[in-house]
Protein backbone atom coordinates (compact mmCIF):
# COMPACT_ATOMS: atom_id res chain seq x y z
CA UNK A 1 0.00 0.00 0.00
CA UNK A 2 1.33 3.42 -0.94
CA UNK A 3 0.84 6.83 0.62
CA UNK A 4 -2.52 8.46 -0.13
CA UNK A 5 -2.92 12.23 -0.08
CA UNK A 6 -6.37 13.76 0.25
CA UNK A 7 -5.91 17.29 -0.97
CA UNK A 8 -7.63 20.32 -2.45
CA UNK A 9 -5.82 21.19 -5.69
CA UNK A 10 -6.56 24.92 -5.37
CA UNK A 11 -5.37 25.12 -1.75
CA UNK A 12 -1.93 26.30 -0.70
CA UNK A 13 -2.01 24.06 2.37
CA UNK A 14 -2.52 21.00 0.18
CA UNK A 15 0.06 22.25 -2.30
CA UNK A 16 2.72 22.32 0.44
CA UNK A 17 2.49 18.57 0.84
CA UNK A 18 2.46 17.84 -2.90
CA UNK A 19 5.51 20.07 -3.32
CA UNK A 20 7.54 18.32 -0.63
CA UNK A 21 6.52 14.88 -1.90
CA UNK A 22 7.80 15.93 -5.33
CA UNK A 23 11.11 17.14 -3.90
CA UNK A 24 11.51 13.89 -1.98
CA UNK A 25 10.58 11.77 -4.99
CA UNK A 26 7.95 9.92 -2.96
CA UNK A 27 5.25 8.03 -4.82
CA UNK A 28 1.69 8.56 -3.64
CA UNK A 29 -1.94 8.29 -4.69
CA UNK A 30 -3.71 11.62 -5.00
CA UNK A 31 -7.36 12.03 -4.04
CA UNK A 32 -8.33 15.54 -5.11
CA UNK A 33 -11.48 17.33 -4.00
CA UNK A 34 -12.73 20.91 -4.01
CA UNK A 35 -15.40 22.80 -2.09
CA UNK A 36 -18.90 21.66 -2.94
CA UNK A 37 -17.89 18.35 -4.52
CA UNK A 38 -19.33 14.92 -3.80
CA UNK A 39 -15.82 13.69 -3.05
CA UNK A 40 -15.37 16.20 -0.23
CA UNK A 41 -18.81 15.46 1.21
CA UNK A 42 -18.01 11.75 1.17
CA UNK A 43 -14.66 12.31 2.87
CA UNK A 44 -16.42 14.19 5.66
CA UNK A 45 -19.14 11.54 5.97
CA UNK A 46 -16.64 8.68 6.10
CA UNK A 47 -14.49 10.35 8.74
CA UNK A 48 -11.48 10.57 6.45
CA UNK A 49 -10.60 14.07 7.66
CA UNK A 50 -9.70 13.91 11.39
CA UNK A 51 -9.84 17.69 11.86
CA UNK A 52 -12.54 18.24 9.26
CA UNK A 53 -10.27 19.77 6.64
CA UNK A 54 -7.67 19.04 3.99
CA UNK A 55 -4.94 17.95 3.50
CA UNK A 56 -4.71 14.54 5.11
CA UNK A 57 -1.90 12.08 4.39
CA UNK A 58 -2.80 8.43 4.93
CA UNK A 59 0.24 6.28 5.63
CA UNK A 60 0.87 2.81 4.26
CA UNK A 61 -0.61 1.24 7.41
CA UNK A 62 -3.77 3.35 7.17
CA UNK A 63 -2.79 5.95 9.79
CA UNK A 64 -4.18 9.39 8.85
CA UNK A 65 -2.03 12.48 9.43
CA UNK A 66 -3.86 15.85 9.30
CA UNK A 67 -2.51 19.41 9.19
CA UNK A 68 -0.20 20.49 6.37
CA UNK A 69 2.77 21.62 8.44
CA UNK A 70 2.65 18.53 10.65
CA UNK A 71 2.70 16.42 7.50
CA UNK A 72 5.69 18.38 6.20
CA UNK A 73 7.64 17.68 9.39
CA UNK A 74 6.77 13.98 9.29
CA UNK A 75 7.83 13.57 5.66
CA UNK A 76 10.99 15.65 6.06
CA UNK A 77 12.30 13.83 9.14
CA UNK A 78 15.81 12.53 8.49
CA UNK A 79 16.36 14.79 5.45
CA UNK A 80 17.93 18.20 4.92
CA UNK A 81 14.43 19.65 4.65
CA UNK A 82 14.16 19.38 8.45
CA UNK A 83 17.61 20.02 9.96
CA UNK A 84 18.72 17.88 12.90
CA UNK A 85 20.52 20.76 14.64
CA UNK A 86 18.19 21.82 17.48
CA UNK A 87 18.64 25.57 16.99
CA UNK A 88 18.14 25.47 13.23
CA UNK A 89 15.16 23.15 13.64
CA UNK A 90 13.62 25.56 16.15
CA UNK A 91 14.02 28.38 13.62
CA UNK A 92 12.34 26.24 10.97
CA UNK A 93 9.45 25.50 13.30
CA UNK A 94 9.22 29.15 14.32
CA UNK A 95 8.62 30.20 10.73
CA UNK A 96 6.10 27.39 10.27
CA UNK A 97 4.15 28.37 13.39
CA UNK A 98 4.19 32.00 12.25
CA UNK A 99 2.93 30.95 8.81
CA UNK A 100 -0.16 29.34 10.30
CA UNK A 101 -0.74 31.89 13.06
CA UNK A 102 -0.10 35.12 11.13
CA UNK A 103 0.71 34.80 7.43
CA UNK A 104 -2.06 32.40 6.40
CA UNK A 105 -4.70 34.39 8.26
CA UNK A 106 -4.15 37.35 5.96
CA UNK A 107 -2.44 36.27 2.73
CA UNK A 108 -4.42 33.06 2.25
CA UNK A 109 -7.69 34.42 3.60
CA UNK A 110 -7.71 37.47 1.31
CA UNK A 111 -6.90 35.24 -1.64
CA UNK A 112 -9.74 32.88 -0.71
CA UNK A 113 -12.24 35.72 -0.38
CA UNK A 114 -11.31 36.85 -3.90
CA UNK A 115 -11.24 33.34 -5.38
CA UNK A 116 -14.01 31.18 -3.92
CA UNK A 117 -17.56 32.21 -4.82
CA UNK A 118 -19.04 30.77 -1.63
CA UNK A 119 -16.87 33.15 0.43
CA UNK A 120 -17.49 36.30 -1.60
CA UNK A 121 -20.18 37.55 0.79
CA UNK A 122 -17.55 37.73 3.54
CA UNK A 123 -15.36 40.10 1.53
CA UNK A 124 -16.59 43.37 3.00
CA UNK A 125 -14.64 46.48 1.96
CA UNK A 126 -13.46 47.04 5.53
CA UNK A 127 -12.23 43.48 5.90
CA UNK A 128 -10.44 43.48 2.55
CA UNK A 129 -8.60 46.72 3.39
CA UNK A 130 -7.58 45.35 6.78
CA UNK A 131 -6.34 42.09 5.25
CA UNK A 132 -4.39 44.02 2.64
CA UNK A 133 -2.65 46.18 5.23
CA UNK A 134 -1.95 43.28 7.58
CA UNK A 135 -0.74 41.07 4.74
CA UNK A 136 1.66 43.71 3.48
CA UNK A 137 3.03 43.99 7.03
CA UNK A 138 3.61 40.23 7.14
CA UNK A 139 5.28 40.30 3.74
CA UNK A 140 7.49 43.13 4.97
CA UNK A 141 8.66 40.89 7.82
CA UNK A 142 9.64 38.21 5.31
CA UNK A 143 11.26 40.82 3.07
CA UNK A 144 13.40 42.11 5.92
CA UNK A 145 14.70 38.63 6.68
CA UNK A 146 15.21 37.52 3.08
CA UNK A 147 17.08 40.71 2.23
CA UNK A 148 19.99 39.21 4.16
CA UNK A 149 19.40 35.47 3.73
CA UNK A 150 18.79 33.17 0.77
CA UNK A 151 16.51 30.93 2.83
CA UNK A 152 14.24 31.36 5.82
CA UNK A 153 16.18 29.09 8.19
CA UNK A 154 19.64 27.63 7.77
CA UNK A 155 21.92 27.54 4.76
CA UNK A 156 19.55 25.73 2.42
CA UNK A 157 15.85 25.27 1.72
CA UNK A 158 13.78 23.66 4.47
CA UNK A 159 10.14 22.89 5.12
CA UNK A 160 9.86 26.45 6.42
CA UNK A 161 10.45 27.67 2.87
CA UNK A 162 7.88 25.24 1.51
CA UNK A 163 5.32 26.29 4.12
CA UNK A 164 5.72 29.99 3.29
CA UNK A 165 6.11 29.51 -0.46
CA UNK A 166 2.67 27.97 -0.89
CA UNK A 167 0.61 31.10 -0.28
CA UNK A 168 3.30 33.73 -0.87
CA UNK A 169 3.84 32.76 -4.51
CA UNK A 170 0.18 33.50 -5.30
CA UNK A 171 -0.16 36.53 -3.00
CA UNK A 172 -0.11 38.96 -5.91
CA UNK A 173 -2.36 37.07 -8.31
CA UNK A 174 -4.91 35.74 -5.82
CA UNK A 175 -4.66 38.17 -2.93
CA UNK A 176 -4.00 41.41 -4.79
CA UNK A 177 -0.85 42.19 -2.81
CA UNK A 178 1.75 44.50 -4.34
CA UNK A 179 4.69 42.14 -4.74
CA UNK A 180 6.76 44.80 -6.50
CA UNK A 181 7.40 46.17 -3.02
CA UNK A 182 9.27 43.00 -2.05
CA UNK A 183 12.29 42.28 -4.30
CA UNK A 184 13.93 39.94 -1.79
CA UNK A 185 10.77 37.84 -1.61
CA UNK A 186 10.53 37.72 -5.40
CA UNK A 187 14.16 36.55 -5.62
CA UNK A 188 13.45 33.88 -3.01
CA UNK A 189 10.37 32.74 -4.94
CA UNK A 190 12.57 32.37 -8.02
CA UNK A 191 15.10 30.32 -6.05
CA UNK A 192 12.34 28.04 -4.83
CA UNK A 193 10.90 27.55 -8.31
CA UNK A 194 14.37 26.74 -9.67
CA UNK A 195 14.99 23.87 -7.24
CA UNK A 196 15.19 20.40 -8.84
CA UNK A 197 11.92 18.55 -8.50
CA UNK A 198 9.81 21.68 -8.20
CA UNK A 199 6.16 21.36 -9.21
CA UNK A 200 3.58 24.10 -9.57
CA UNK A 201 0.25 24.52 -7.81
CA UNK A 202 -1.65 23.04 -10.76
CA UNK A 203 0.77 20.15 -11.38
CA UNK A 204 -1.37 17.30 -10.06
CA UNK A 205 -0.02 13.73 -10.29
Positions of predicted regions on the chain:
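Residue-level recognition of oxygen-bearing side chains
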Residues: 70, 184, 197
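GST-like fold's C-terminal all-alpha helical module
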Residues: 96-193
Amino acid sequence: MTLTLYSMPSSGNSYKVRLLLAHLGRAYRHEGMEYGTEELARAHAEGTLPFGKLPVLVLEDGTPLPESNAILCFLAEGTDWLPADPVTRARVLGWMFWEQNQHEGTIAVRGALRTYAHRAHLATPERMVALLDQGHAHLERMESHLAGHDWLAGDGPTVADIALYAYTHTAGEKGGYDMDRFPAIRAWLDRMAALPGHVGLTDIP
